[in-house]
């Protein structure tokens, strides 16, 4: 079943049926003010943190997808009313036509009902601490119409704990008042003039307003039938205490063919409402602000554009996968319809992997995240698994979060910096290849010598931080020389305790190879000697202890008693995705063993919806293996199609030179290819998800937890760097693709260090991998050297 389509010319996904089986969401805001909004205008807004500074209310996992950011319309002659988004009023779809266009950092809603066509475009202007609703109402009938418009949001009590508990305090700690066209919400306990005030205003002079939620909705009613809309007028409620909203009402008389346009502004900060109301009275300022959002993404998307025989790949890489990856870098894992704000902060491994994907489009945020992570590393070398970067930012360390009437304990230094017992064995290693990728992209080698403090005191250069990470993993190994699993590795549910993780040893090797590339560029002989010897030892340990001869693949690890996990003889958890893909991706293993391992991945783990994390799934609890054995079969870490490591398999197959297999893996997970089977997928077809139900679950193929997943960054990085093969070096650009043999070629436009490269890859011999010749601006070359900033360069690569 199909609910919409991709409009590639406008970089929009168009929803033509609003009754999709789950909320399909989008992100508005690229800086501090953010709105997570659904195709029915449900969702919530926050400033910087959805834990401390929630602007509007959200009730997760409700079937109604409410509350939200709503425009109601009422025919004042008949009393009939509806909403510009299908929800919350939900007019019969035989009578009303709705369309939603989710774009990059904006969403457009359109409703055509009973001779009135209305549109509402929501976005967050760059540089503003506010959200703008651009609303237009047109009378398409042949009669004059009197239409009332109501803008509505429900305000939050700011802190997630105040919103969801201890109402005996929060209900009596805020108030609203209406002055000069602005309905201002005062969090009275918060003395901060910025974070202590939210507002809703509009460019019209309101005929009526409400600041009390229950006055607007009415008792025993909800957002579907507010009493104020039913009556055609708000009650001008504004006072202290109880639940609060922002509701503004204006009546318009429209002649046949006449339009009216206005803006509604939702924002943060005392007095800011009047300023922005005055600014956006000139609707050309609304147009300019929206054009700024479009330009923002035009510039980012232009950094890498591909035209290939695979339309789904082009659609996702040219817009949606990059957009999702940037969203994860900015908003981490703390704001979605699943992660609803109770965990503000950065996951170490998540952020380090997110940042590998976007140094070309967002170098400033990539650099910031790297600094955040290095500040969150301790002298011993490991990273703090989950931390608030403000804790270690000297400019923000003394800034307190929004005050709350609910007692929320302030974490002590001991709470912030955990010990080995709570350390995940993989976290710190991801940052090493990400730093290398950043330096290659930007050419900013000075970053490597920048001095950054450790979380537990002292400081070191970035180069020394990288070595500390490598040294920690070299120290914490078992008797076999394989890295200890510690609390967990990348798989949080694989709790090996005193056991050993194959995945982490392969990751250690990959990080070592990345560091050695940097050390060689710096001609650091001492570091080269030390870490080359370390890498050789890791490779030997992996090949000696992790290969399963009977199965022909790499095991997942060993328990604390030395029992192997993931062998041919085992009936549960026989083959695992992480260890086998990273074995090849890292470069630690031979071509022969790599091919065998990936053949096992294909045989045991492949499905039409992507690669399973392990198979067969665990049915018998075993605490020596971990909590993964107590997860339902086919769900999440126990035999689901866990999306994040799927791109590792794409890289592995590309490194093996098997382009057809790499593309088969890519296509199976690509949400674009599931656009016509939403009855199975359920989730958005423009977003990668955390996991898809595995074959051992009755909902096999159902996608869960969209948007905030490391899948997006890895999908982008794997596709652009290894399938399409366009990779940056310290001084050169490499084009070394691995594609399906049937492809005749493809084209890429790549911006790098201010120069533009128009790359044409031609495949006259029908191969998957292997570069026969390279031309740069018509001249045969052995390598593509960095060209002058501002130059346009034609690159032709012949495969053979």
UniProtKB/Swiss-Prot annotation:
Q: Which residues bind N-acetyl-D-glucosamine?
A: 492, 636-637
Query: Which reaction(s) does its UniProt entry say it catalyses?
Result: N,N'-diacetylchitobiose + phosphate = N-acetyl-alpha-D-glucosamine 1-phosphate + N-acetyl-D-glucosamine
What Gene Ontology molecular function terms does this protein carry? carbohydrate binding; glycosyltransferase activity
Organism in which the protein naturally occurs: Vibrio furnissii
Q: Which residues bind N-acetyl-alpha-D-glucosamine 1-phosphate?
A: 333, 343, 349-350, 490, 492, 637, 644, 690, 709-710
Stated role: Catalyzes the reversible phosphorolysis of chitobiose (N,N'-diacetylchitobiose or (GlcNAc)(2)) into N-acetyl-alpha-D-glucosamine 1-phosphate (GlcNAc-1-P) and N-acetyl-D-glucosamine (GlcNAc) with inversion of the anomeric configuration.
Q: Does the keyword Glycosyltransferase apply?
A: yes
Q: Describe its assembly.
A: Homodimer.
Q: Which domain of life is it from?
A: Bacteria
- Return the similarity comment: Belongs to the glycosyl hydrolase 94 family.
Q: List the thermal properties of the activity.
A: Optimum temperature is 20-37 degrees Celsius.
What top-tier enzyme class does this entry carry?
A: transferase
Give the Pfam families listed for this entry: Glyco_hydro_36 (PF17167), Glyco_transf_36 (PF06165)
Known EC number(s)?
Answer: 2.4.1.280
Q: What is the lineage of its organism?
A: Bacteria, Pseudomonadati, Pseudomonadota, Gammaproteobacteria, Vibrionales
User: Which catalytic residues are annotated?
Assistant: 492 (proton donor)
Identify the SMART domains for this entry: CBM_X
What does the entry report about how pH modulates activity? Optimum pH is 6.5-7.0.
Q: Which keywords fit this entry according to its UniProt record? A: Carbohydrate metabolism, Glycosyltransferase, Transferase
Q: Which InterPro entries match?
A: 6-hairpin_glycosidase_sf, 6hp_glycosidase-like_sf, Carb-bd_put_dom, Gal_mutarotase_sf_dom, GH36_catalytic, GH94_Enzymes, GH94N_ChBP, Glyco_hydro_65_N_sf
Biological process according to GO = carbohydrate metabolic process
Q: What is this protein called?
A: N,N'-diacetylchitobiose phosphorylase
